[in-house]
Amino acid sequence: MSVSQKVLVLGLGASGRTAARFYASRGFEVLAADTRPQPPRLDELQKEIPNLKFLGGAVSPVIVAEVSEVMISPGLSPEYSVFAPAVKEAKHRGIAVVGEIELFARELKKLKAETGYAPKIIGITGTNGKTTTTMLSTAIIAEAGKSVVAAGNVGPNALGELEKHRQVGTLPDFWVLELSSFQLETTESLHCDGAALLNITEDHIDWHGSMEKYAAAKRKIFSADTVRVLNREDPGSMLSAEGVPSDLVHTLSLIHISEPTRRTP
């Protein structure tokens, strides 16, 4: 973000508002747009960021030339929403189009470089079961005596939680992130130490454009060395085991459960 000190935030839901605050706190001028002429809590945000410029409705692609980065909220498709022309123009110009999780991932890397903070990151995705698995994983980690924060699609948003815990000195040992395909689509820097892909069934095709693009977004949860937990009963999940060292792949099944090993007396 060196070309310009101006950024464009598309969508002023919870993630967009958090991103706007984040950018403003780093000295950037924030342009913000929303499909609604008066999104909830806009007045509050404008009081927090006095020089915030708000645009209601579609954004002219011309405005992209003024900014160095575009942040798009997860509910807005980069390709099929009213903001698609602006996103297309940004990509054409080589301007990064990111989501809130990408900002979270960047800040983690910055914190590690500056302070050595290196928490374990657990990612959870899948068409169904994300929230339940996220909550169970968080409870198990807490029961083991580790400090842990659950965030992401389950709420609250990860960037906001990172900012909050950094300010009060309570950064956790673990982050458990529920990640939707929408969030993963605009994420490049996140490195999960472990991640679960529970299942992939047809969903959100109107947002992604095709089943193939939807599945590809889900698989972005994995880095090359991420420990993967996959569902043996789901072909879409198991595709993520292909070409991966066996020690990085763990599978589960709720249908075919092996008999427990019995000890001989």
Q: Language model features by range: what are they?
A:
Residues M1-G99, L103:
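N-terminal leader/targeting and accessory segments in enzymes
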Residues A14, P37, G129, G155, ...:
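Short, glycine/serine-rich, charged loops/turns that create anion-binding
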Residues A24, V62-A65, P78-R232, G236-D247:
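Phosphate-binding loop of NTP-binding sites
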Residues G27, H191, T261:
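Conserved functional loop/turn residues at catalytic and ligand-binding sites
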Residues T35-P39, A58-V59, S180-S181, R232-G236, ...:
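Short, polar loop motifs at secondary-structure junctions
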Residues I49-L55, G243-L254:
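Active-site regions of enzymes building and remodeling cell-envelope glycoconjugates
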Residues I255-P265:
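Single conserved hydrophobic/aromatic residue that forms the stacking wall/gate
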